[in-house]
């Protein structure tokens, strides 16, 4: 399955659930305590990260989505710390702060990246009035593309059926990371993402792939779901839907350091991808890739679009061809992480001819990746006159993307690509013709960034205008 990253910035993701604060105390262990046979950790570094539903929202925001987080906290220092962290990553938080409850906090003591102890500070919110959070959900739904329910069984989601009903009535898909064995409360959700242990706790021991699919399909029908995605650790993931063949996705992890928060990454990537316009199959495949990245990190972590682009490049040599500006910037960042030299050129390329092909082949040889920025129809018309272009923007870009020398093709609507060049900042900017480098649009921006601007010669005797003239004469 070929995957191109969507424009995550368009996605609006609402996350509701059990928010937590994860704290990590790091330090060496050089001796045993004289008070008891336990190691003494000399704490040298303290770290705090959002956990639970907060980590789900953090993962969506890390992809570039507009994330909103709703949940229950105490009126304490931990809630302030959590809110401050989320504000720092531009996640909009609207917590119900309760005076009689502590914010759920999990403190982990680590030495040499090995967890020695975990301390939990929590009291379940099971007796809290559900309307307090429901009112906030109703306010947030109209400005959301998808809703995630992140259930850790701590009590924030004590009216799951009501939340699902309101979201589905508004036409908003609901993805649920379930907890426990009572799946009845998730009836009518769009998709559930249980791990294998959670799945078997509901359906019983699974005996092979066929049994997995059969039992999964029974759950889909029983609880009126659109789909079920079972995450299976080293066995990857399986997507199950009624009336469609199952989709098995092999695990992508190369090294596993910590599975903490991997489920959060899966559901956030899946939901954000769907909100950005991907199909369910594509979104599941991308979530699988994200899971393979995050388990290679210590603790609850996030995955960036650049990391995804790099992983996709490694897996399938994809992410090339016609792109939006946002997609291009991610691809360029990923290329730079791989140490690749990025070359950029631009033009109308109205009727592609041998001169164009030769020029682009020569430009491509100057680096590892070649970007071709193409004037849109309106831009060409302003530059060339009312009779141009002959071919539309989409057609011109499709032809360019088919050339072996070209990696990425992107449109620009202005008369010059100066703004786009300033955003991309290629290592080498090339232009064909009789220009002086200093006269080329983007020269100042590229050279100020340490890049180079170079002029290449066009092949003699090749001209789009001449071709058009010849066609008209022979017309």
Curated annotation (Swiss-Prot):
Pfam hit, one: CTP_transf_like
Binding site for ATP: 195-198
Pathway assignment: Nucleotide-sugar biosynthesis; ADP-L-glycero-beta-D-manno-heptose biosynthesis; ADP-L-glycero-beta-D-manno-heptose from D-glycero-beta-D-manno-heptose 7-phosphate: step 1/4; Nucleotide-sugar biosynthesis; ADP-L-glycero-beta-D-manno-heptose biosynthesis; ADP-L-glycero-beta-D-manno-heptose from D-glycero-beta-D-manno-heptose 7-phosphate: step 3/4
E.C. number(s) listed in UniProt: 2.7.1.167, 2.7.7.70
GO biological process: ADP-L-glycero-beta-D-manno-heptose biosynthetic process
Family designation: In the N-terminal section; belongs to the carbohydrate kinase PfkB family.
Region (Cytidylyltransferase): 344-475
InterPro entries reported for this sequence: Bifunc_HldE, Carboh/pur_kinase_PfkB_CS, Cyt_trans-like, PfkB_dom, RfaE_dom_I, RfaE_dom_II, Ribokinase-like, Rossmann-like_a/b/a_fold
Quaternary context: Homodimer.
Coiled-coil parts of chain: none
Source taxon at top rank: Bacteria
Disulfide partners: none
Region (Ribokinase): 1-318
Name the UniProt record assigns to this protein: Bifunctional protein HldE
Top class in the EC scheme: transferase
Active site: 264
HAMAP family: HldE
Annotated source species: Aeromonas salmonicida (strain A449)
Gene Ontology molecular function terms on file: ATP binding; heptose 7-phosphate kinase activity; heptose-1-phosphate adenylyltransferase activity; phosphotransferase activity, alcohol group as acceptor
Keywords annotated in UniProt: ATP-binding, Carbohydrate metabolism, Kinase, Multifunctional enzyme, Nucleotide-binding, Nucleotidyltransferase, Transferase
Swiss-Prot/TrEMBL catalytic activity: D-glycero-beta-D-manno-heptose 7-phosphate + ATP = D-glycero-beta-D-manno-heptose 1,7-bisphosphate + ADP + H(+); D-glycero-beta-D-manno-heptose 1-phosphate + ATP + H(+) = ADP-D-glycero-beta-D-manno-heptose + diphosphate
Job description of the protein: Catalyzes the ADP transfer from ATP to D-glycero-beta-D-manno-heptose 1-phosphate, yielding ADP-D-glycero-beta-D-manno-heptose.
GO cellular component: cytosol
């Amino acid at each position: 399955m070929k995957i191109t990253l969507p424009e995550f910035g368009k996605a609006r993701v609402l996350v509701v659930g059990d928010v937590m604060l994860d704290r990590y105390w790091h330090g060496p262990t050089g001796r045993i305590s004289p008070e008891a046979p336990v190691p003494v950790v000399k704490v040298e570094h303290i770290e705090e990260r959002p956990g639970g539903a907060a980590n789900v929202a953090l993962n969506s925001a890390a992809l570039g989505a507009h994330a909103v987080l709703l949940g229950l906290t105490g009126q304490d220092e931990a809630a302030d710390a959590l809110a401050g962290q989320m504000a720092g990553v531009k996640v909009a938080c609207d917590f119900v702060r309760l005076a009689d409850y502590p914010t759920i906090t999990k403190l982990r003591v680590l030495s040499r990246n090995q967890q020695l102890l975990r301390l939990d500070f929590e009291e379940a919110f099971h007796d809290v009035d559900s309307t307090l959070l429901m009112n906030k959900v109703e306010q947030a739904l109209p400005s959301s593309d998808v809703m995630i329910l992140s259930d850790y069984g701590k009590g924030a989601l004590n009216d799951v059926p009501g939340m699902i009903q309101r979201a589905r009535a508004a036409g908003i898909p609901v993805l649920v990371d379930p907890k426990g064995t009572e799946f009845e409360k998730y009836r009518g959700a769009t998709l559930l993402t249980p791990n294998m242990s959670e799945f078997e706790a509901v359906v019983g021991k699974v005996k092979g792939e066929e049994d997995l699919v059969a039992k999964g399909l029974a759950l889909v029908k029983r609880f009126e779901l659109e789909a079920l995605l079972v995450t299976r650790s080293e066995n990857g993931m399986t997507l199950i839907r009624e009336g469609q063949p199952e989709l098995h996705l092999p695990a992508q992890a190369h090294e596993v350091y910590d599975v903490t928060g991997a489920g959060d990454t899966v559901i956030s990537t899946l939901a954000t991808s769907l909100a950005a316009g991907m199909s369910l199959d594509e979104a599941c495949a991308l979530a699988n890739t994200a899971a393979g990245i995050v388990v290679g990190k210590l603790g609850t972590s996030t995955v960036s679009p650049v990391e995804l682009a790099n992983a996709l490049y490694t897996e399938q040599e994809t992410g090339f061809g016609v792109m939006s500006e946002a997609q291009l910037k991610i691809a360029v960042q990923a290329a730079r992480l791989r140490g690749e030299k990025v070359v950029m050129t631009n033009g109308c390329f109205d009727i592609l001819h041998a001169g164009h092909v030769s020029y682009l082949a020569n430009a491509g040889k100057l680096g590892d990746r070649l970007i071709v920025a193409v004037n849109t129809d309106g831009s060409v018309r302003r530059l060339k006159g009312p009779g141009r272009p002959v071919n539309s923007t989409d057609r011109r870009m499709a032809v360019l993307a088919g050339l072996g020398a070209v990696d990425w093709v992107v449109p620009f609507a202005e008369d010059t690509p100066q703004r786009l060049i300033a955003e991309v900042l290629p290592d080498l900017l090339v232009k064909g013709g009789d220009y002086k480098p200093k006269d080329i649009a983007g020269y100042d921006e590229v050279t100020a960034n340490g890049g180079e601007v170079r002029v290449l010669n066009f092949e003699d005797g090749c001209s789009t205008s001449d071709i058009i003239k010849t066609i008209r004469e022979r017309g």
